[in-house]
């Protein structure tokens, strides 16, 4: 059981999760010409909040997560809501390759900083996107480690220019980025610190 299995049951109770997802989804809809013929993959979907916001703009979304408890939460939400164009996939894309499927759009938010080999996962995204399709990544700008605190083994955000270069290296074009949200996070009893979130968009030529 990983840390996200433990957090799954209370994940949707955090209003920041919803506010952040809505800000990111709205910016995606503004910048990418989504349509009802497009299939999408949300990588590291969590409880699927972003996909639920984007579902009416796309033909179908596959909600992928390697946390079985998060997937159970999504399955339950899909069942209760009666939504027909969302489906879940309990899969670890870091460790395995997804075979015989392609998407027109891959997106993720606040996931990349948990990924060990960022260039490897971007390459996998490229291999999974149809020509003309899009990639959208929302995550933290480089920060001093305060966001997660001691013991975190992932990335303390990203240098946006270096990440853009990595995305370009894997074959994407039309790369653009902008700030899309600010998380005001309590990092101690007396200190609340702002952490800016970027959205980077790229296209598979």
Residue ranges with predicted function:
Residues 146-162:
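Acceptor-substrate binding/catalytic loop of class I
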Residues 119-134:
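A short glycine-rich, Lys/Arg-flanked "PGG" loop and its adjoining helix->strand segment in the class I
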Residues 110-114:
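Short catalytic micro-motifs in class I SAM-dependent methyltransferases
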């Amino acid at each position: 059981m990983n840390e996200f299995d433990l957090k799954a049951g209370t994940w949707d109770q955090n209003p920041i999760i919803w506010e952040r997802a809505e800000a990111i989804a709205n910016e995606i809809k503004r910048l990418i010409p989504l349509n009802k013929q497009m299939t999408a993959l949300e990588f590291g979907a969590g409880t699927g909040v972003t996909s639920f916001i984007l579902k009416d703009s796309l033909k179908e979304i596959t909600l992928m997560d390697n946390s079985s408890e998060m997937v159970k939460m999504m399955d339950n939400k899909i069942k209760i809501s009666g939504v027909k164009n969302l489906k879940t996939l309990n899969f670890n894309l870091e460790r395995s390759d997804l075979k015989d499927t392609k998407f027109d759009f891959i997106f993720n938010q606040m996931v990349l900083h948990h990924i060990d080999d960022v260039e490897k996962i971007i390459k996998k995204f490229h291999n999974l996107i149809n020509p003309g399709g899009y990639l959208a990544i929302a995550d933290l700008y480089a920060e001093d480690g305060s966001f997660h605190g001691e013991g975190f083994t992932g990335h303390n955000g990203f240098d946006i220019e270096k990440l853009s270069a990595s995305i370009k290296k894997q074959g994407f074009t039309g790369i653009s980025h902008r700030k899309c949200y600010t998380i005001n996070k309590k990092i101690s009893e007396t200190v609340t610190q702002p952490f800016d979130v970027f959205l980077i968009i790229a296209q598979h030529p």
